[in-house]
């Protein structure tokens, strides 16, 4: 199973963003991961619409957007028009998550949910038929550089085991995604990995060297 390696662009150097995008694409990454935060659902602010539009227009690889915001349904059409390929919502923020996931698909975009560490499989299982991707948070959302929460490993196993019963979604991980965790989780069937400071950014090696090493794990 080929891994999906997805650099978290919140960790990139925005003073040379075009160069970052080009280097990451040359390294062989699969999807650009773009974080949007509203300062309400999470106590931080993420990338702006102009940043996302620029990355989507500049990149030749797909882009996803992770909406850590209240009332995500209000913004689905806006992000779809910017050119994103995948939209993740947090069901914890949306009382009509089923409708919002269908809106995403109707907009011609792949749909996903991001599941907080404290949210169980049972809580979201009725949404899974409408998901192309399920991204499990292994840290509390909103900040880079946190430590992996060990108790979520069992939840990864549950979501992987149930995938075929709910339409065959791909399982992703976001948060503290180190090479050691990538190796462990890929063995149990996790497909995609959001790469931040734990695995990709701020290292002494080139992006290509790191991506090649992660592919080999």
What kind of region is each of these model predictions?
Residues 4-8, 32-34, 63-67, 87-89, ...:
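Hydrophobic faces of well-ordered beta-strands that scaffold small-molecule active sites
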Residues 73-81, 119-129, 177-193:
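Catalytic cores of alpha/beta
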Residues 27, 58, 82, 107, ...:
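Structural motif
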Residues 20-34, 78-81, 124-137:
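Alpha/beta enzyme core
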Residues 32-49, 139-145:
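Glycine-rich, proline-tolerant flexible connector loops at the mouths of alpha/beta enzymes
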């Amino acid at each position: 199973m080929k891994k999906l390696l997805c650099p978290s662009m919140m960790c990139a150097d925005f003073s040379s963003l075009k160069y970052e995008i080009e280097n990451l694409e040359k390294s062989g990454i699969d999807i650009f991961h773009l974080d949007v935060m509203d300062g309400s659902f999470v106590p931080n602010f993420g990338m702006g619409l102009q940043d996302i539009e620029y990355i989507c227009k500049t990149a030749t690889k797909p882009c996803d957007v992770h909406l850590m915001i209240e009332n995500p349904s209000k913004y689905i059409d806006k992000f779809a028009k910017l050119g994103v390929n995948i939209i993740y919502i947090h069901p914890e923020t949306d009382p009509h998550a089923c409708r919002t996931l269908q809106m995403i698909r109707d907009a011609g975009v792949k749909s996903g949910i991001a599941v907080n560490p404290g949210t169980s499989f049972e809580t979201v299982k009725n949404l899974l038929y409408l998901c192309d991707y399920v991204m499990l948070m292994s840290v509390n959302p909103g900040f880079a550089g946190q430590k992996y929460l060990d108790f979520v490993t069992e939840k990864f196993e549950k979501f992987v085991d149930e995938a075929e019963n709910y339409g065959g979604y791909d399982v992703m991980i976001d948060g503290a995604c180190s090479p050691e965790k990538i190796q462990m989780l890929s063995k149990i069937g996790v497909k995609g990995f959001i790469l931040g400071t734990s695995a990709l950014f701020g290292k002494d090696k080139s992006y290509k060297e790191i991506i090649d090493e992660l592919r080999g794990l």
